[in-house]
Amino acid sequence: MKVFFAVLITLFICSMIIGIHGVGINVKCKHSGQCLKPCKDAGMRFGKCINGKCDCTPKG
């Protein structure tokens, strides 16, 4: 159980670090699937929909 908790905390911290480096682009969205192509076209690796706008994670 302690190992599971440690892995869970590690994943949470890593996801927060990735989210901090997000770059917002001016593309409206309703779900994250709509952000994949605009983010790749902008030279980014991943994209997710946050508050109705695409938030992209840079390559690196």
UniProtKB/Swiss-Prot annotation:
Lysine amide modification, residue list: K59
Main location: secreted
GO molecular function: potassium channel inhibitor activity; toxin activity
GO cellular component: extracellular region
Cystine crosslinks: C29-C49, C35-C54, C39-C56
Tissue: Expressed by the venom gland.
Compartment(s) where it occurs, according to its Swiss-Prot or TrEMBL record: Secreted
Taxonomic superkingdom: Eukaryota
Keyword rRNA-binding: no
Keywords, sorted A to Z: Amidation, Disulfide bond, Ion channel impairing toxin, Neurotoxin, Potassium channel impairing toxin, Secreted, Signal, Toxin, Voltage-gated potassium channel impairing toxin
Signal peptide: 1-22
The keyword Secreted is assigned to this record: yes
Family indicated by similarity: Belongs to the short scorpion toxin superfamily. Potassium channel inhibitor family. Alpha-KTx 03 subfamily.
Function in brief: Blocks voltage-gated potassium channels. At 2 uM, blocks rat Kv1.1/KCNA1 and Kv1.3/KCNA3, has a strong effect on rat Kv1.2/KCNA2 and Kv1.6/KCNA6 as well as a moderate effect on Shaker IR.
UniProt free text on domains: Has the structural arrangement of an alpha-helix connected to a beta-sheet by disulfide bonds (CSalpha/beta).
Note: Negative results: has no effect on rat Kv1.4/KCNA4, Kv1.5/KCNA5, Kv4.1/KCND1 or human Kv11.1/KCNH2 and Kv3.1/KCNC1. Has no effect on bovine KCa1.1. Does not inhibit the growth of Gram-positive and Gram-negative bacteria. The primary structure of this mature peptide is identical to that of toxin alpha-KTx 3.19 from Mesobuthus eupeus (AC C0HJQ6).
Protein name as it appears in the record: Potassium channel toxin alpha-KTx 3.6
